[in-house]
Regions:
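Surface-exposed patches in mature extracellular/periplasmic domains of secreted proteins
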Residues: 48-56, 113-117, 140
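Catalytic Zn2+-binding segment of zinc metalloproteases
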Residues: 102-119, 136-137
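Hydrophobic helix-coil surface modules that form long, contiguous segments used
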Residues: 1-99, 128
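Acidic/His/Gly-enriched intrinsically disordered linker/tail segments
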Residues: 9, 123-140
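Sec-exported extracytoplasmic/periplasmic mature domains
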Residues: 42-46, 107-108, 130-138
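Active-site metal-coordination segments of metallo-dependent hydrolases
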Residues: 27-31, 115-123
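An acidic- and aromatic-residue-enriched active-site/binding cleft used to recognize and process polar
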Residues: 59-62, 78, 108-112, 121-124
Length: 140
């Protein structure tokens, strides 16, 4: 399935196989978290989102929490579609995952390090996820 979310002139598409209506009801929150992460990173870096589109694909059984690619991010379904009553920790993990993978659009896709420096990129990004996600944790 595909669902689109639009804010101003920016459109984001989500692709997924989930059919549970209770889980699909979380898409609005996920879209808002992705959009907030994009805005925060644009403000933080002073660089507009650098690619023509942004999509995310929620995959059943995906082996990682998330993996960004230019213009699209793959996410594990269990990391994105939470239980009907998620704990604050589960919501925080999802929010930080979105912030982390979105940050890769600037730090990894727009500016790519050579392979020998990849360790540094993975160590730097955790410092951007907490401040990026602090502004859009549900209920705060």
């Amino acid at each position: 399935e595909k669902q689109e979310y639009k804010e101003g002139s920016r459109k984001i598409s989500a692709y997924y196989r989930e059919t549970d209506p209770k889980k699909l009801a979380q898409l609005d929150t996920i879209f808002k978290q992705v959009m907030a992460s994009l805005h925060w990173l644009e403000d933080y870096t002073g660089v507009s989102y650098p690619f023509a589109k942004y999509d995310f694909i929620i995959l059943p059984g995906f082996q990682y929490g998330g993996m960004e690619h230019t213009g699209a991010t793959l996410y594990n379904d269990n990391q994105m579609f939470l239980s009907e009553h998620p704990t604050p920790d589960e919501e925080l993990r999802r929010t930080e995952l979105i912030a982390h993978e979105t940050a890769h659009m600037w730090f990894g896709d727009l500016v790519t390090m050579n392979w020998l420096m990849m360790y540094g990129q993975k160590k730097f990004l955790p410092t951007t996820s907490p401040p990026a996600s602090a502004n859009f944790i549900p209920g705060h």
